Amino acid sequence: MEIILFLTMMVMITYVFSGYLYRVALVQSSRVDLIFTRFENMCFKIIGTDLEHMSAKTYVKHFLAFNGFMGFITFVLLIVQQWLFLNPNHILNQSIDLAFNTAISFLTNSNLQHYNGESDVTYLTQMIVMTYLMFTSSASGYAVCIAMLRRLTGLTNIIGNFYQDIVRFIVRVLLPLSCLISILLMTQGVPQTLHANLMIRTLSGHIQHIAFGPIASLESIKHLGTNGGGFLAGNSATPFENPNIWSNFIEMGSMMLLPMSMLFLFGRMLSRHGKRVHRHALILFVAMFFIFIAILTLTMWSEYRGNPILANLGIYGPNMEGKEVRFGAGLSALFTVITTAFTTGSVNNMHDSLTPIGGLGPMVLMMLNVVFGGEGVGLMNLLIFVLLTVFICSLMVGKTPEYLNMPIGAREMKCIVLVFLIHPILILVFSALAFMIPGASESITNPSFHGISQVMYEMTSAAANNGSGFEGLKDDTTFWNISTGIIMLLSRYIPIILQLMIASSLVNKKSYHQDKYTIAIDKPYFGVSLIVFIVLLSGLTFIPVLLLGPIGEFLTLK
């Protein structure tokens, strides 16, 4: 009942919040202008931008240049961190390959962590590098999504200014909400301090170092920005990051807030096309929510069912291996599905200890990479499937392929297919390399089916810019650091460039009014068709390897 109530509340909250996002996205005046405008203008002066509207090509150039500069600075700071200030725990520099992976991971909103937060990064890098990139990577994804929506919906005839979009989103959305969430988490016991680790003597007489630091400030944007990288190695399974059931709900709600609001924002932007087309966003929301609930139900069933091998020994009950007692199997499964559906990557239990079908659920969500998804880019990925569904359905019934009164031609379809293929190609090719290269396969700690699942989960998490992992895998090696770094880089920027190209190409075409010769995108059957094509296309791509991994493991448990 608490899960149903929580999900219902989040749907209502995100619908209301989308109204505020609409004003931010369209640079409309609001009551908070007096508070934020001066700070925004100061940021614009520091950046040196004149706020002129950019072309799509210029927008992408500035997006890539901004991200490239941040990535370089991050890499340098990580390899010299031991000589900088705010290092009371005397942490050493990261290796070149680990710094490469870490910089790309946080730059791309993935937060795949091949390091231990307690022992491999200083307070300075936690705040200046990790926390800063959590803001900017999230805002970058939002900015390019809004640019795409402006073009597709025809709400304005401009794509916008990249720096204006990113600054407004950080100042008016991320910073205020992060401060609020940080305070809420501190009231629940999450630490916020710059003191060195505590050194205590245990009851057995041994010395133990207890790691903490500025956790609350990182924890808030970690979930709000769908980042996922933990201050501590145990992530949100540790009491310092996620002390109780209330902090657990705060963190889950933070993950869901902005990606769900983006779909409602899309609906508000479609309002110029009339009430009928406005319902299109609702159809998309219901379709994605249906897949979300289906995967959640499957995961919870598997986790509550437990391990059949233990049941044969007379030990019944849910699968509690790798889980925190304060959350139990239900809230652990919910957190797992939310963190992979919204591509956050934060964990409150160990995914490597999930049952085979329990691990299949989050893996499938990352392979689909469209069920709400991360900040901005999740909606962009969904729209690619929408365009693909419109095109296929139109050809099947002999109608004209068009979307929002814009015809879909050969040029757009080439880009759409390329965006669709990038994701599985990166996952499957690099997974094959991991099994072929001896040094890489030595990182697998489990034999047979589960070892395949470990590799597939790692590569899928990197390609989906998620960041969670089956942490039994020994991933801090040169191969895993470089390979996953390349995957995160390519899977982030190539689709974004192509998606903006698609939007610009569509809007430059001659539009015409919807008639009987076009597919109605506001009808329930379109939502059903979308679900079928998402499952069918992704199923054909990944079902062979899933049979070798989690499904094969499930069939061996008797």
UniProtKB/Swiss-Prot annotation:
Disulfide bonds: none annotated. GO terms for molecular function: P-type potassium transmembrane transporter activity; potassium ion binding. It is found in: Cell membrane. It holds the Pfam family KdpA. The chain crosses the membrane at residues 1-21, 66-86, 127-147, 166-186, 245-265, 281-301, 327-347, 354-374, 377-397, 416-436, 482-502, 531-551. The keyword Transport applies. One of its GO terms (cellular component) is plasma membrane. It is a multi-pass membrane protein. Keywords: Cell membrane, Ion transport, Membrane, Potassium, Potassium transport, Transmembrane, Transmembrane helix, Transport. Its main location: membrane. The system is composed of three essential subunits: KdpA, KdpB and KdpC. Belongs to the KdpA family. Part of the high-affinity ATP-driven potassium transport (or Kdp) system, which catalyzes the hydrolysis of ATP coupled with the electrogenic transport of potassium into the cytoplasm. This subunit binds the extracellular potassium ions and delivers the ions to the membrane domain of KdpB through an intramembrane tunnel. NCBIfam families: kdpA. This is Potassium-transporting ATPase potassium-binding subunit 1. The lineage of its organism: Bacteria, Bacillati, Bacillota, Bacilli, Bacillales.
